[in-house]
Amino acid sequence: MRRIPPLLALLAATLLLMSVAFADGRPTVFYDSHSYDVMGRDLIETVQDWPASNHNKYERHLKMSDWPVPSDRLTDPQTEGARSPFYGVLLHGAYLFTTIWGLAALQSFLAAWVIYLLWRTMAPRAPSWSYLAMIAVAAVGTSISFYTTFAMPDIFAGIGGAAVVLILAQGDRLKKLEIAGLWAVCAYAMVIHKSHWATELLLAFAGGLLLWIVGLSTQSVVRRVVLVVSAAVVAWAAGAVFDQIYQNRTGYRLGHPPFITARVLADGPGEAYMRQACAQTAQGGAQPYVLCKFQTNVGHSTKVKVSGELISNLILWSDKKTLGVFNLASRPQRVGLESEEMRFVVGTVKFDPLGTLGASLWDWGQELVAYQVDDPLRNPSAYLRGHYWPTTMLPKLIPNFQACRPPGDCRPPFNDMVLADWHGVVLVVSLLLLVWRMSLKDVRQSLWRRGLKTGEDPARVGASVLLLVGVLVLNAAVCGILSGPFARYQSRLIWLLPISLGLVASALPMRIKGLAPWIKRRWDGVSDLWERARAQPVIGRFLPPLGGHFMRFCCVGGLGFIVDFGVLTTIVDLGVNKIAARLLSFSVAVVATWLVNRVWTFRDYDGPKRSLAREFGSYLSVQSVGFAANFAVYTAVIYAAPVHNEHLQLLLGSLAGTAAGLVINYLGAKHLVFRRGVRAS
C-alpha cells in the first residue's frame, strides 16, 4: 500500500485535531489569554522601538476591584512576569492577521507534525493509515484536541516534551532540518512557560541517563543532551533580555505572583510556620515577612471547604477582604511577597521537613492522576459579564462573541463529567495495554542487553515510550509541587499515553493472542508468592488460599465494584440523584456478581436442585443485608468526608461501602445461598 504524502497526512491530522473547535463552533479562550495578548503587544512594540513616552497608555492597576480606566491594555507588571510575551506574539499575531482560528490551526499542525515524526522514526515501515488512525483516536478519545484549539500555551507542554524525546531517542533518524525545527519547538515551549522549561530540562538529564544505560554511546548522549540544554539557555536568555528591556522602557520590573508561597500555605506546613514566625517577632521588632500582615486572611482561606488547589487560588486571587492576600496587596506589598518567597519556602521546609515532603508527594500524586479537561470547557459568556472582562481583549478574541453575550449562551456541547469518564476509560485501557506490551520478551530483553548499541527496534521503541511516560511524571512533579494539583496542568499532555500506545502498535506486533497467556503467567507468579507467604509461620495462618472461595469471592467483588461504580458515575453524570443512582447501580451489580459467583466462585457446591428464582432470592436477601452496611458507610463518606472532587467522593464512598459489606456477603453466600448440597437447576 502506497504511503499518503506527508503534507497531506499532516493536513488531515491537523483537521482531526481541530475537531473539538469545529463541534463547538469556535476555539476557546481563558482569562489569562488577555494577559498574554497584552504582553505580546508589548513585545511587538519593543521590537518596533516605540518611544517610552507612548507607554502612558499602560494603565497599571493594583487590584481587580480598582481599575482606573476601562481598557484592553490593563495589566499589572507584578503579575505579568508569569505571562510570556513570546506566546502573546503568537496569539496577537493570529488576532491581527486571521482570528484565533489561525492560532488553533497552527497549534494543531505543530502537534500533528511532532507526532508524525515520532511515528515515522519509531515505526518507519508502518502504513500511513496507522498514523491517521492514531490521530483520530487521540482526537476523539483524549484531551489533545481541547488544548490544540485553546488560546493558551498549554499544548506546548506536550509538544515540547515530545520534541525533547525525539531529539534524545531518535536523533539519528532525523534530518538536520527536522532537528533544527524540533530544537526551535523546544526553545519556544521553554520560553513561553517556566513549568515547560523545568520539565524539559529535567527530562533531558534523566532521559540522557536512561539512554546511556540502555546502550546509547556516551558521545551521542552528551551531544543530544547539550542540544536540549542549549535550547533551555536560549529560552532563559530571551526571557531575561525582555524583562530588562521592559523595565528600562516602562520603569516597572516584571514580577510574578508567589505561587509556591500559596502552595505551602494551602498544604498546611506553611501556615503553621507563618504563625510561629510572625508570633515570635510580633512582640518586639519588625515582622519577618510581608505575609504576616495577611495571616488572618490566610487562616480564613485555609478553613474554606474547598480542595487544596482552590485554597491557593483564594490566597492569590480572592477580592474578599477576609480571604485574599496577593490581590488585596498594594504594589510594594506585592513586590515584598515575591522577594520573600524563597526565604519563606525554605523556612517552611526547615520548620516541618516531613510535613512539607508528605504534602509535596501528595500534590505530585494528585497531579499525576488529574486528567479531566476543565478550563477549555468554560462557557465563553463568563468573559462577557461584569464591568471589567468585557473591556479586555477577550471579546475580540472570541469568534462571533456577540452570540455569547449575556443573556446569550454558547457553552461548549460537552458534558465535563461524561467526558472525564470517557477519557478515563481510554487512559486506563491504554496504560494496561502499554504495560503489557512493554513487558513482553522482545522489548524487555532488548533493553536489558543494551540494544541501542546495535540500533534494535524494540530497544528504541521501549526507550522512547519510557521517555514519553517520563514527560507525564516530571510534569506532574513540577506543576503539582510548585503550583498545585490543577487538572489543566496534567490533562494538557495526558494524551501522550494513548499516543505512546499507538506508536507501539504501529512499530511492534501487538500479539493480542498472547494477552491471555501473559495474564495467566502473571497470575501464576502472584499465586507462587502468595503460597510462599502462607508457608511462613507467623503470617501464614491469617492468609486464606489464593484459589479458595474467599479470594475468588473478593475477585468477583472487585468486578461488582467496577460495575457498581461505572453505572453509578454514568447515571450521576446524567443528572440522577446520588442516592437513587446508588440503588440502581447496586441492583445491576447484584445480578452481575450472582451470575459470576454461581458459575465460578462456588461452582463446586453441587447437590439437590432448586429453582434459579429461589437461589437468586436468597442471594438478593444476603446482599441486601450487606448492602445495608455498605449503604450506611457510603452515605456517611459522601456527606462527611472532607473531599470536594465529586468523582473522588463517589470513589471513596463506594470503596468504603464495598469493604463494609464484604464479610457479611461472603458468609451469607457461603453458608446460606451456595451451601453444600444445594444447587439451583
Task: Give short role names for the model-derived ranges.
Residues 179-194, 231-236:
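Membrane-interface alpha helices of multi-pass inner-membrane proteins
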Residues 25-39, 47-71, 77-90:
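Extracytoplasmic catalytic/substrate-binding loops of multi-pass membrane glycan-assembly enzymes
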Residues 164-180, 211-215:
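Membrane-interface transmembrane helices that cradle and orient dolichyl/undecaprenyl
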Residues 76-113, 147:
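Loop-to-helix entry region of an early transmembrane alpha helix in multi-pass inner-membrane enzymes
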Residues 146-156:
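Short acidic/glycine- and proline-prone juxtamembrane loop motifs at membrane-interface regions
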Residues 93-107, 359-468:
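Membrane-interface anchor segments at the N-terminal boundary of transmembrane helices
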Residues 26-52, 228-339, 357:
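Juxtamembrane membrane-water interface segments immediately following transmembrane helices
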Residues 101-126, 140, 159, 163:
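Transmembrane-helix motifs of polytopic, lipid-linked glycan transferases
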